[in-house]
Amino acid sequence: MPITNASPENILRYLHAAGTGTKEAMKSATSPRGILEWFVNFFTCGGVRRSNERWFREVIGKLTTSLLYVNKNAFFDGNKIFLEDVNGCTICLSCGAASENTDPMVIIEVNKNGKTVTDKVDSERFWNVCRMLKLMSKHNIQQPDSLITEDGFLNLRGVNLAHKDFQGEDLSKIDASNADFRETTLSNVNLVGANLCCANLHAVNLMGSNMTKANLTHADLTCANMSGVNLTAAILFGSDLTDTKLNGAKLDKIALTLAKALTGADLTGSQHTPTPLPDYNDRTLFPHPIF
């Protein structure tokens, strides 16, 4: 069930549409333990499982609003997120300290009448879900079933993002394969490690963006403005760069010869250090295009 309007209310409706059940099930789901389990599932899977989720509209409404004002660095430095009066409970989200051998974990505490239940979730997956909620709200993005992919990427697969303005956004580690970015503003955007396989990037503005290690396999970049873009170690297999502006771009460790077309491309002042050709039979790197 896609979200057609990414307001907090509609995000909630989407997340909780499957919820039905008895009074006993509702009581269990909205107990401190039930609320805690819902948060763990949500921040682990980027979605929810079928278990009376319609009772949590208030939770996501407050969470989405809170996240609009949360700074990642401040949160990881010790600032906490509080959600008050969720079925009589107070929820506290905080980042625990990293140990020598493990990354930090996000601690979820649910308190009611002086009793507290706690659990932990992976900090990277937690913040990716937060990033996705913020992007959906800010840019009114129509979203498929899961906020993040099975690999932990922000899930923008096949999404229509045409004519939007993402200037200066952090879009690192997104999976936007087969997405439509036509005439979108992506200048000064962080696209490090982004999966843009088979994406339509016709006439986009990518000036000054960081696309290090981005996967542009079979992407349509015709007439795009990529002046000053950092494409270090990016994958351009089968990409169409016809009439693309690449002046001043950093093209180190890439194989331009694998691009589908460079006709009319402007490479003035670009820095190109070629790399040995990869194995283009490897379909994990070079999947077949979907048209």
Curated annotation (Swiss-Prot):
Location in or out of the cell: Secreted; Host membrane
Keywords: Host membrane, Membrane, Repeat, Secreted, Virulence
Main localization of the protein described in the UniProt heading: secreted
Any Gene Ontology biological process: protein secretion by the type III secretion system
UniProt induction comment: Expression is regulated by the two-component regulatory system SsrA/SsrB. Induced after bacterial entry into host cell.
Pfam families: Pentapeptide (PF00805), PipB2_N (PF21684)
GO cellular component, one term: extracellular region
InterPro entries: 5peptide_repeat, Pentapeptide-BTB/POZ_domain, PipB2_N
Domain of life: Bacteria
Segments forming domain Pentapeptide repeat: 154-193, 199-238
UniProt cross-references to PANTHER family, sorted A to Z: BTB_POZ DOMAIN-CONTAINING PROTEIN KCTD9 (PTHR14136:SF17)
Stated role: Effector proteins function to alter host cell physiology and promote bacterial survival in host tissues. Does not appear to be required for the formation or the maintenance of either Salmonella-containing vacuole (SCV) or the Salmonella-induced filaments (Sifs). Not required for intracellular replication in phagocytic cells.
Protein name (record): Secreted effector protein PipB
Native organism: Salmonella typhimurium (strain LT2 / SGSC1412 / ATCC 700720)
